[in-house]
């Protein structure tokens, strides 16, 4: 187990931290993240799996898993609930807040941890989602209406003091937990015991038999083609009137369903490898997805966002792919949309960055995914001293690629035209760690299951010369990878 207790005493002497992560390594040649999450799900209803692959389909170095959170923190319409899951009677704190961020900061301060160079980038923190509707806290003047699912949470985060990280480069499983510095000797012994329990669980734990997903109705869009095209025309009217330059209109696809989304996740990770792949399970909801797009990333003081805008389906051959790429980079409508969203990304990053540090590090490259290709850029800045990871979420959520420009007015028009609570779609999924870092993706290319219904939501960016029928088809293209994963999962996996 490392660091040693002597090393931790040296860290404690600095007086900056409340917790230090410790790690034990075991060989991973007998285990996979998919097998491990089955074991963790059997041990705890609350669990997650975060994985990554690049656009070239090379797997990222780490897969992160967690189970048995210390607490679950939710907020819905300003009502914040903190449930201490380790307490026998699961005591719950309920309070009304103007913004959940202050409470999140208090919780994170109690676990403040250093970055240990030998360890992976995530060694404990808050994992979960901020919904699209979380914007009500950073933009209180934006009035979001009551819709068909008023109990959909604005935020659902779980605090994980223990992390299981698969290091795919070294073929090791890293078992990580925290040593609290207040009672160092006892906490160190407790951590040794916890790491042994984690090792035993991974090696010998019972595995969950996830029930297969069974659709009880056809997957259908909420807005038929004719209705969606009407919405596009109304959005174009606002553009011509000068209210906005661009707006993203989404179209949910729903079906009644029973069973688990776990096999859908397995298909997605195999057929649609993406920078952000996630499986998330709680008492309230089950999520599976493969998002291509970062919302915001904070490492130390460096902030990064990666706007993706401009879409084409993948070609059947390399030559067809190249032709589609060339056409995409010559499409004035797509280029105009992308440039607007790069400018919006610079503006969002600039709100919390030091003056003069915001720059476009990469501009208009083609990013390939299993079903579609996008134009991508990278915008970065240096975080101001008076700002933190929660400020970063406030500044950038929802992404311009899922709302529009100007963002505030675009969100008002979305509220008027969509007439439904977006929920997770267009929000953020990822982690805020105990060292102050943040890594979140935009909540797209996902399916969630709640109250016996699955939902897949996708959108299209509407600009002045948008063709309504093409925008409807773009929504369908973006949803296609998830729909195919559901269909393939139903056929049965070994």
Indicate residue ranges for each PLM-predicted region.
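Extended alpha-helical targeting/anchoring segments
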Residues: 1-494
């Amino acid at each position: 187990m490392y660091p040693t207790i002597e090393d931790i005493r040296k860290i404690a002497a600095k007086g900056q931290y409340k917790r230090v992560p410790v790690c034990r390594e075991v060989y991973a040649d007998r285990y996979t993240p998919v097998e491990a999450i089955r074991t963790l799900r059997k041990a705890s209803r609350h669990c997650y799996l975060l994985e990554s692959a690049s656009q070239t389909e090379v797997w990222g170095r780490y897969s992160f898993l967690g189970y048995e959170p210390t607490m679950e923190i939710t907020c819905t319409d300003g009502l914040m609930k903190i449930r201490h899951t380790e307490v026998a009677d699961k005591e719950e704190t309920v309070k009304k807040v103007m913004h959940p961020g202050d409470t999140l900061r208090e919780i994170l301060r109690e676990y403040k941890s250093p970055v240990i160079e030998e360890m992976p980038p995530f060694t404990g923190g808050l994992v979960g989602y901020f919904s699209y509707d979380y914007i009500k806290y950073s933009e209180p003047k934006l009035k979001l209406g009551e819709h068909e699912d008023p109990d959909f949470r604005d935020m659902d985060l779980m605090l994980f003091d223990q992390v299981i990280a698969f290091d795919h480069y070294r073929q090791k499983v890293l078992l990580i937990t925290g040593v609290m510095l207040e009672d160092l000797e006892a906490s160190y012994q407790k951590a040794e015991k916890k790491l042994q329990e984690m090792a035993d669980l991974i090696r010998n734990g019972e595995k969950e038999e996830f029930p297969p997903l069974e659709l009880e109705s056809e997957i259908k869009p909420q807005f038929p083609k004719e209705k969606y095209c009407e919405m596009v025309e109304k959005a174009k009217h606002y553009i011509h009137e000068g209210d906005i330059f661009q707006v993203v209109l989404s179209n949910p696809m729903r079906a009644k369903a029973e069973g688990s989304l776990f096999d859908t996740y397995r298909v997605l990770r195999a057929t649609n490898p993406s920078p952000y792949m996630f499986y998330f399970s709680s008492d309230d909801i089950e999520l599976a997805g493969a998002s291509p797009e970062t919302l915001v990333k904070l490492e130390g003081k460096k902030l990064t966002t990666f706007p993706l805008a401009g879409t084409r389906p993948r070609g059947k051959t390399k030559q067809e792919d190249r032709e589609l790429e060339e056409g995409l980079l010559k499409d004035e409508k797509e280029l105009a949309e992308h440039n607007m969203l790069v400018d919006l990304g610079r503006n969002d990053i600039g709100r919390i960055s030091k003056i003069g540090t915001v720059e476009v590090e990469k501009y208009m490259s083609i990013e390939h995914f299993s079903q579609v290709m996008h134009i991508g850029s990278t915008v970065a800045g240096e975080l101001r001293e008076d700002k933190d990871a929660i400020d970063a979420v406030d500044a950038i959520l929802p992404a311009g690629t899922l709302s529009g420009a100007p963002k505030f007015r675009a969100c008002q028009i979305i509220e008027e035209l969509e007439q439904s609570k977006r929920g997770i779609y267009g929000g953020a999924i990822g982690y805020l760690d105990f060292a102050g870092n943040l890594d979140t993706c935009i909540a797209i290319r996902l399916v969630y299951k709640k109250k016996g219904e699955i939902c897949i939501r996708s959108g299209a960016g509407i600009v002045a010369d948008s063709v309504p029928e093409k925008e409807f088809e773009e929504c369908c293209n973006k949803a296609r990878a998830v729909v195919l994963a559901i269909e393939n999962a139903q056929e049965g996996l070994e």
